[in-house]
Amino acid sequence: MAQLRSAGLLAATLALALASPAHAVIGGQPENGALSTQSLMILSSNGGVCTAVVLADDVLATAAHCVTGTQEHRAHYRAADGTPVLLEIAAKAVHPEYDADAIATRRRSIDLALVRLKQPLPARFQPASLATANVREGGVVTLAGYGTTDESDKSGRAMGVFNAVDLAVVEPYGPSSILLWLSDAGSAGRGGCQGDSGGPIVAGSGVVALSTWTTGAGQRNCGALSQGVRVGPQRTWIDATLEGWGRRAKWQ
């Protein structure tokens, strides 16, 4: 696919992809509460869609793979009247330990990035609280995002609405100080999917991780395990980056 190289083309692609709003997150439910005011979308010029978490009125946190590998990225939300809005990115910081080939090579990677927007978000968006809590196996967290509810759909119409789902923390490879693994305790195939990367994973009222990856049964890519990068262990890097931008994250 040819890369799109202008905001106009990005807007046209967005209009086609999101012409018919649909649900997001496999097996999730619409989330219209506080969490929805702390999240928005990231669009890439290669057609990629991700979710991002608001840290300040012009700063977002997302997965590193959402803002690397293409020439253009935009933050997206819908105005009160439903009009699509695209915001340009002024700066981005990718975690120094991010490895784009980590999945294929099974190397360690911290799939995390921060982006600063060229203009502030509307007042209806509020900064999320990041949490250092170390949720362990058996704990229940909420995963949310703008991703697809049907991974077989290639039109983009099965994504674009903010949904959330409760999942159980699992430790298939033992405790991890970097990653958080989640599974549907009811074995109904619920979880994150394409478009949910960078979205919040919440315990209580704090974001403990950002979605980064999913697996599925058989030929599917979603519905088995959902993975996130923990934000607590990366606090030093997050705080230092935001300080350089004259911003501060909220922690609990």
Language model regions located:
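C-terminal subregion of chymotrypsin/trypsin-like serine protease catalytic domains
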Residues: 32, 38, 48-49, 54-68, ...
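N-terminal signal peptide c-region/cleavage motif recognized by signal peptidases
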Residues: 19-21
